[in-house]
Amino acid sequence: MKLVELIKNLTIELQDGPLDREISGIAYDSRRVKPGDLFICISGLKSDGHLFAGQAIENGAVAVLAERQLDTGGKATLLTTPDTRSALALLAANYYGRPSKSIRVVAVTGTNGKTTTTDLIKAILEEAGKKTAIMGTLYAQVGEIQREMQHTTPEALEIESFMALCREEKADYIVMEVSSHALQLQRVAEIDFNVAVFTNLTQDHLDFHQNMDNYRAAKLQLFQMIKEEKQNYAIINIDDPWAEEIFQAATIPCRSYGIKKRSDYQAGELKIDLDGSSFRLHYGDNSLMINMKLIGLFSIYNALAAISFALQEGIDPGLIQSALARVEGVPGRFEKVDCGQDFAVIVDYAHTPDGLENILQTSRELGKKRLICVFGCGGDRDRSKRPLMGEIAAKYSDFCVVTSDNPRSEDPHAIIAEIIPGMDKVEKSRYAIIVDRREAIRHAIHLARTGDLVVIAGKGHENYQLVKDQVLEFDDRKVAAELLRGKVK
């Protein structure tokens, strides 16, 4: 593709060099530049791409897009534009031929529940015979082709590349998790979404957004960017405190789901135990009984979001029932670890105050004898949620083991010291501090007796632990299983 074609509709402030150069690819990481590429200088959270333009040119870049004038030594065409991050989204879409226009794209956003909801939507669509791609926290996949993802929502270049692959594979739908980071950083700015699904909004990522107003504003962008076309709409959790604001901000028709408030798709007759959940869905003059292996009130909310979408798409109710009955669950989301012990062990990704409260409240309602919770808080992330999570853990648990999560560059002891004041607010609070996560899990399992429930929260599906600059092999599920096998013997 010629450079002049690639930059169509892009605001160019300065041009130094020819526009008839042939562009063979786009890169924003100088280490990945190949001969013939356009290199886009992105000012990131940790580094500035403008500092690596010279390296990109040495690696073969024939054009550079920047926010300020740079010396290319006459070896590459230099273009400047006000915002290279939004430019990356535009040029990636141009380069790959805007694949989202030819596939129905469903965006799922919210603090908690995105991964499970996308998984359930995919299961229902596939039950209905629709070829469905998925993109999210765990991976991106279409058919048998799977790509690992570095972020919940990757950079625009990776998104458009994957969507182009989905177009080649003739996918009918792409269901993707859309994070607040992606919305604020313009990663999805050029995608033609058809449906937006809202799960909930609670405190998270304030290390990035600074406050809840900014976090909320980032989420709202999704409901304002979808084109007002006949087949486009939003699905909203009406029980969430922020629902009304989304209804008012949305530029497309909205449908609601819920349990507590009157909604278009409403669940009643709820039953939850360690074998699964069931409920009756009421919509219009119709009702539908849903039985599934997923556990918890939060799982019912996720299922409601997926069902509401499916019914809006005109999918047969019987197919919805059979799809949900078969779903085993998402790795690391309220996942049982069973080695024949006479007490229950659950691993969950809950790493926000609301997420932790959801799983502990559900665990408490399961009616087991004692609830033992192992948890910590991530380093280099929103510090204000640490005492909140401590208070929640102490409120619902009979005993807590406070430990490391992913401490990153922070001292694990310092993180725990910010958790404890929240726990001390709870009069009945009982806890132990064991910084080593493996030993913390060992202690919780050692304490467990017949009929108890141990919840290991925070890391879920993750198979690593981030300590300083190291990525250590660590999987809560494997560690728990190994320790349980030792105890059962």
From Swiss-Prot:
Record carries keyword ATP-binding: yes
Residue(s) carrying N6-carboxylysine: 219
EC nos: 6.3.2.13
Record's GO cellular component terms: cytoplasm
Residues reported in the UniProt entry to bind UDP-N-acetyl-alpha-D-muramoyl-L-alanyl-D-glutamate: 30, 152-153, 179, 187
Alphabetized UniProt keyword annotations: ATP-binding, Cell cycle, Cell division, Cell shape, Cell wall biogenesis/degradation, Cytoplasm, Ligase, Magnesium, Nucleotide-binding, Peptidoglycan synthesis
Chain positions of motif Meso-diaminopimelate recognition motif: 405-408
Molecular function GO terms recorded: ATP binding; magnesium ion binding; UDP-N-acetylmuramoylalanyl-D-glutamate-2,6-diaminopimelate ligase activity
BP-aspect Gene Ontology terms: cell division; cell wall organization; peptidoglycan biosynthetic process; regulation of cell shape
Main subcellular location of this protein, as a coarse class: cytoplasm
Chain residues that bind ATP: 110-116
Amino acids binding meso-2,6-diaminopimelate: 381, 405-408, 458, 462
Catalytic activity: UDP-N-acetyl-alpha-D-muramoyl-L-alanyl-D-glutamate + meso-2,6-diaminopimelate + ATP = UDP-N-acetyl-alpha-D-muramoyl-L-alanyl-gamma-D-glutamyl-meso-2,6-diaminopimelate + ADP + phosphate + H(+)
InterPro entries named in the record: Mur-like_cat_sf, Mur_ligase_C, Mur_ligase_C_dom_sf, Mur_ligase_cen, Mur_ligase_N, MurE/MurF_N, UDP-N-AcMur-Glu-dNH2Pim_ligase
Needed cofactors: Mg(2+)
Pfam families on file: Mur_ligase (PF01225), Mur_ligase_C (PF02875), Mur_ligase_M (PF08245)
Compartment list: Cytoplasm
Top EC class for this record: ligase
Cell cycle recorded as keyword: yes
Pathway(s): Cell wall biogenesis; peptidoglycan biosynthesis
Entry PTM: Carboxylation is probably crucial for Mg(2+) binding and, consequently, for the gamma-phosphate positioning of ATP.
Family (UniProt): Belongs to the MurCDEF family. MurE subfamily.
Role: Catalyzes the addition of meso-diaminopimelic acid to the nucleotide precursor UDP-N-acetylmuramoyl-L-alanyl-D-glutamate (UMAG) in the biosynthesis of bacterial cell-wall peptidoglycan.
UniProt-recorded name of the protein: UDP-N-acetylmuramoyl-L-alanyl-D-glutamate--2,6-diaminopimelate ligase
Designated gene of the protein: murE
